Regions:
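A short loop-to-beta-strand structural motif that recurs across blades of beta-propeller domains
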Residues: 36-38, 76-78, 138-141, 181-183
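Short, solvent-exposed loop/turn segments at conserved positions within beta-propeller repeat blades
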Residues: 32-33, 72-73, 122-138, 177-180
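A short helix->beta-strand "capping" segment at the edge of beta-propeller domains
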Residues: 1-13, 42-44, 48, 196-197
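Beta-propeller domains
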Residues: 22-51
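Loop/turn-rich, solvent-exposed surfaces of beta-rich toroidal or solenoidal domains
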Residues: 180-187, 192-193, 200-207
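Short loop/turn segments that connect beta-strands within beta-propeller blades
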Residues: 40-44, 81-85, 144-148, 186-191
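Beta-rich, blade/repeat-based domains predominating
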Residues: 4, 9-25, 52-71, 76, ...
Length: 207
């Protein structure tokens, strides 16, 4: 499918975490190396929403229009209001060990947060801060802000990256970047995952 594309803003270093607000018509996104969050308003004006984001990556809106943020440098999931204010850390450790570097995040309709936790943000690169890894795996987690419960859902990834639900939230799709494939999990009634077979290969001439 061919579509005409138009540049609406430019001059960034490495953009991630775009989220759309259907009510305000605004697009919010992160520039990871610059530790900044920007907002494109009504497709016209870009303004700086936050600075010192600790090399934030993925974003998602929760049910109250707060922004759930994956922070590489602090290895945590944090939350702000829609204006990037009232920052608070929701979860940063699994047991007594730091999370690796939360990468991407989705919020289920009941408010439970699902996120990937690869090691990209601990590698020597412009999008992270080099430091030893405390966990001995790269996984997928869920976190319930209401109860404070953090669940490890899968730990057999090389480096999980993007994730999304099916429209009915019955399935969770997670890509494993180094392996160039996407896996499909069934979301069980208790919030755990089953299955996990490869659903699509992301290989090709331009990849």
């Amino acid at each position: 499918v061919k579509q005409d594309l138009a540049t609406v803003c430019s001059g960034f270093t490495f953009i991630e975490g775009p989220i759309w607000n259907d009510v305000t018509g605004c697009l919010t996104f992160n520039d990871i190396p610059e530790s900044r969050t920007y907002r494109l308003e009504q497709g016209k004006t870009v303004r700086l929403l936050r600075e010192d984001t600790h090399k934030a990556n993925g974003n998602a809106y929760d049910m109250d229009s707060n922004i759930i943020v994956c922070e590489h440098v602090r290895s945590c999931i944090s939350r702000t209001n829609d204006q990037g204010e009232n920052l608070e850390v929701l979860v940063s450790h699994y047991g007594d060990k730091e999370l690796n570097s939360p990468n991407d995040v989705v919020v289920r309709s009941d408010g439970v947060i699902f996120f990937t936790d690869p090691r990209f943000g601990r590698n020597p690169s412009r999008v992270g801060l080099e430091r030893p890894q405390e966990l001995d795996f790269q996984g997928v987690f869920s976190f319930d802000p209401g109860t404070g419960e953090l669940k490890l859902l899968a730990d057999d990834f090389e480096n999980p990256n993007g994730l999304c639900f099916s429209p009915d939230e019955a399935f969770l799709y997670v890509n494993d970047s180094p392996k160039k494939h996407i896996r499909k999990f069934r979301v069980e009634a208790d919030g755990t995952l089953s299955g996990g077979a490869v659903w699509a290969e992301t290989t090709g001439e331009e990849i």
